[in-house]
């Protein structure tokens, strides 16, 4: 995903989003049904609770079709012009950044015909005050939101200059009566969602969900007569559906997309990918490490990271659509290069080909070219494989470490480095990359295998509620125009809880970051670099790739899509931007 909108937004103490142009539609309905597929491999269940990460609305990324955010941030535009008023028409900071006062849009109705107002917003923030419902990592609130006339004031324990996207852009507003129930029971099933969004549920089946225009929508009539979101098992099946005209908009890695789709009819078939996050290898650092051995040590995690050939992942697993991550800081580069240390120590220090890091960076890190894995593990107290040798300066174990022959494996205290990579088979790119990681690390003396999840639901349920069920996994990042968004997730937010990672220094640096005026770079940059150093040395996550905002679409039915020449919004068919994009499209006559 791509979250680049915040850099220009966070340097101001107040911002009236009502001054920005409202981009909604006044179309007359009648356009043909638009078929959208945000992701593959989701097992449908009739649950549209936006605060249950296992609901079909969450799994498919369709929350904002019904339950809207307060502000729509154009994640490709870091200026105030990229801030679009939605259910809030304005906001401003107070109390040194600890309070955010929202002006709530008037004359809005829910899709059941009832009136929307400030009380619904306040009730929604009571939902995210429950840690079990706070799936997006909204910072801790000091007290309940207060309502005065047409305003709602949110009260936080710490300044929130860095958290606008999470607080205002990813909190999906519920009707107060529903919000009160979800606050008490965050995983309650919502079979028929009530919201203010442009669409409402038309019909549900285990293979297809249909959405119809909300006749009460405050933003005008949606241009589409219907939105269909089908259950598609694999990326290959999505490719077939695009080619046959059974799919108009896909948000996943389509194999050989140009050959298999775009080039068949370049006038209507399109693909545009923008790098907007850091894909990492999650390490299970919960007690027991899911049964893995070795990954509880930072030296082993660093060696794993340095041993991965990221170019192979980018070119083979991602078909060249995503770039190899080049910095162990996990910053999104080159977008965030200004935050890197001036000495160049964390620039291009990761292996992107042939298991060898950039020579200059390797020297700065005191890692001789071609000996990175060897030195890291040897210095960490691990004994090299008995069969190991150096071939043209590159360490090799002498054979694959597969657990059956410890002569090919690094050992320490009678243990070898042993773990599996757990990802959904329907995510063909991740699954291919899991296999590549196994193939790359076994010759380096680590017993690495793959473990399949049969679908997203199986995989996500294991990640969120069964820490003994996985050891490592490939996972996308939260993105962000500023480093804070991903770092918060990794060090203190949802991801940190899932992998079991705690670091007091990281928490302190995040607190300092959130309290710092973004224009005060003399204070800000050293603070961010503390987080970079923690990521680089402790390696709770190994950066792999710069994640693409998957976006493959057909203009045969509708025009007005975001593209490289008109990048008005993160283009992926997912929330929160999905509904915004749908309201900009124009039917082809």
Regions flagged by a language model, labelled:
Residues 29, 208, 213, 307-351, ...:
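Detector for C-terminal structural segments
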Residues 37-95, 194-195:
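N-terminal lobe/hinge region of extracytoplasmic solute-binding protein
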Residues 56-57, 74-76, 168-222, 226, ...:
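Gly/Pro-rich hinge or "lid" segments in bacterial periplasmic/extracellular proteins
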Residues 89-133, 147-153, 238-244, 293-296, ...:
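Aromatic- and charge-enriched surface segment that lines or borders ligand/interaction sites
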Residues 95-96, 101-103, 136-181, 556:
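Surface-exposed binding/hinge segments that line
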Residues 128, 134-137, 144-146, 202-212, ...:
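Extracellular/periplasmic solute-recognition and catalytic clefts
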Residues 206, 336, 356-366, 370, ...:
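Ligand/substrate-recognition segments at binding pockets and active sites
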Residues 254-403, 497-504, 538-555:
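Local pocket/hinge segments that shape ligand/substrate recognition
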């Amino acid at each position: 995903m791509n979250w680049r909108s915040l850099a220009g937004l966070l340097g101001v103490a107040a911002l009236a989003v009502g001054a920005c142009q409202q981009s909604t539609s006044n179309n007359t309905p009648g356009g043909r049904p638009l078929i959208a597929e945000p992701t593959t491999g989701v097992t449908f269940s009739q649950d549209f609770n936006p605060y249950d990460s296992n609901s079909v609305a969450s799994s498919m990324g369709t929350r904002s079709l019904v339950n809207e955010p307060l502000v729509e941030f154009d994640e490709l535009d870091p200026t105030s012009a990229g801030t679009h008023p939605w259910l809030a028409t304005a906001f401003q900071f107070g109390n040194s950044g600890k309070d955010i006062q929202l002006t709530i849009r008037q004359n809005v109705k829910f899709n059941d015909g009832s009136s929307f107002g400030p009380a619904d917003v306040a009730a929604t923030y009571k939902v995210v005050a429950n840690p079990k419902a706070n799936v997006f990592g909204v910072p801790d609130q000091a007290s309940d939101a207060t309502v005065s006339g047409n305003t709602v004031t949110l009260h936080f324990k710490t300044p929130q200059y860095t958290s606008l996207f999470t607080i205002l852009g990813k909190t999906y507003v519920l009707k107060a009566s529903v919000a009160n129930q979800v606050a008490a029971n965050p995983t309650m099933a919502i079979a028929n969602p009530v919201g203010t969004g442009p669409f409402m549920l038309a019909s549900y089946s285990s293979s297809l969900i249909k959405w119809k225009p909300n006749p009460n929508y405050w933003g005008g009539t949606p241009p589409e007569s219907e939105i269909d979101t089908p259950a598609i098992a694999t990326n290959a099946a999505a490719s077939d559906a695009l080619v046959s005209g059974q799919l108009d908009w896909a948000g996943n890695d389509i194999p050989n997309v140009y050959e298999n789709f775009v080039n068949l009819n370049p006038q209507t078939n399109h693909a545009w990918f923008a790098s907007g996050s850091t894909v990492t290898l999650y390490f299970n650092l919960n007690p027991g490490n899911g049964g893995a051995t070795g990954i509880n040590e930072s030296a082993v995690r660093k060696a794993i990271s340095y041993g991965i050939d990221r170019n192979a992942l980018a070119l083979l697993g991602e078909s060249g659509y995503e770039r190899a991550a080049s910095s162990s800081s996990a910053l999104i580069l080159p977008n965030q290069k200004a935050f890197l240390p001036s000495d160049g120590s964390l620039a291009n220090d990761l292996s992107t080909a042939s298991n060898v890091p950039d020579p200059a960076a390797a020297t700065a890190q005191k890692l001789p070219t071609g000996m990175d894995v060897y030195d890291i593990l040897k210095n960490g107290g691990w004994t090299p494989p008995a069969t190991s040798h150096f071939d043209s300066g590159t360490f090799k174990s002498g054979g694959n470490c597969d657990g059956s022959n410890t002569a090919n494996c690094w050992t320490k205290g009678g243990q070898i480095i042993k773990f599996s990579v757990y990802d959904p088979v329907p995510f063909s790119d991740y699954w291919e990359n899991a296999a590549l990681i196994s193939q790359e690390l076994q010759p380096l003396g680590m017993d690495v295998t793959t473990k399949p999840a049969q679908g997203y639901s199986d995989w996500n349920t294991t990640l969120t509620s069964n820490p003994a069920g996985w050891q490592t996994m490939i996972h996308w990042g939260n993105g962000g125009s500023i480093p804070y968004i991903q770092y918060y997730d990794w060090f203190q937010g949802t991801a940190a809880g899932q992998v079991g990672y705690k670091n007091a220094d990281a928490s302190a640096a995040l607190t300092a970051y959130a309290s710092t005026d973004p224009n005060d770079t003399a204070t800000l940059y050293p603070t961010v670099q503390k987080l970079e150093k923690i990521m680089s040395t402790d390696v709770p996550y190994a950066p792999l790739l710069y994640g693409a905002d998957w976006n493959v679409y057909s203009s045969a039915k509708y025009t007005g899509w975001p593209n490289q020449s008109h990048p008005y919004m993160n283009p992926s068919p997912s929330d929160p931007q999905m509904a915004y994009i749908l309201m900009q499209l124009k039917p082809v006559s």
